[in-house]
């Protein structure tokens, strides 16, 4: 069994994670271990076919969109497409199923925009494989929940020991699967 401890080599990452990114937020809702590993410098996404496939879907599903909309990077978030005129944030997901983590990641983007003076935005989660679009709004209870989640994320990230792994059945398509489950039958 692999034991994950924060070593001297990667303690430098703890001080860099002052801003929570959309990825941190998404991983928090999916797997605390994945969040901890990612935030502490163990990043497996570059070797993941699923991540590569998601990037391709993002780049090819809506080719004409880049003419009208903008990709935005701000305070640790990276928005796929922003429609300035209507204040709509578009987030594209490769998944063949909807996820609460997807909704909260988009709500977090809306929250960060709001904190930076871009008010009254709405979000659209787009699932090209499903041919579905889902509207996402940010409510007052959502804002409170986001503030609580940010504290919880920072607590996990700054812990010296990573959280336990989830059961194999929940990890099949995870880019960290081999890291967490290698050597198991």
Regions found by a protein language model. Give the residues of each.
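Short, charged, amphipathic alpha-helix that recurs within catalytic cores of restriction-modification
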Residues: 102-113
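Short amphipathic alpha-helical segments and their helix-coil junctions
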Residues: 10-18, 84-93, 152-161
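Short connector loops at helix/strand junctions that flank enzyme active sites
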Residues: 74-78, 85-87, 101-104, 118
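Metal-dependent nuclease catalytic regions and adjoining charged, substrate-binding loops involved
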Residues: 59, 64-76, 115-185
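Conserved catalytic cores of phosphodiester-cleaving nucleases, focusing on short active-site segments
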Residues: 31, 77-96, 109-111
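Structural motif
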Residues: 22-25, 101, 162-169
């Amino acid at each position: 069994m692999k034991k994950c401890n924060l070593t001297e080599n990667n303690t430098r990452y703890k001080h860099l994670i002052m801003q929570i990114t959309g990825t941190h937020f998404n991983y928090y809702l999916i797997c605390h271990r994945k969040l901890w590993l990612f935030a502490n410098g163990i990043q497996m996404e570059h070797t993941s076919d699923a991540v590569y496939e998601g990037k391709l879907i993002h780049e090819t599903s809506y080719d004409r969109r880049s003419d009208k909309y903008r990709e935005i990077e701000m305070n640790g978030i990276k928005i796929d497409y922003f429609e300035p005129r209507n204040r709509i944030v578009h987030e594209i997901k490769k998944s063949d199923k909807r996820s609460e983590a997807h909704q909260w990641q988009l709500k977090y983007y809306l929250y960060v925009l709001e904190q930076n003076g871009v008010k009254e935005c709405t979000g659209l989660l787009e699932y090209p494989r499903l041919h579905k679009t889902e509207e996402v709004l940010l409510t007052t209870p959502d804002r409170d929940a986001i503030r609580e989640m940010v504290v919880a994320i920072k607590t996990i990230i700054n812990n010296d020991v990573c959280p336990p792994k989830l059961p194999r059945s929940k990890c099949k398509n995870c880019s960290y699967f081999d890291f967490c489950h290698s050597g198991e039958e």
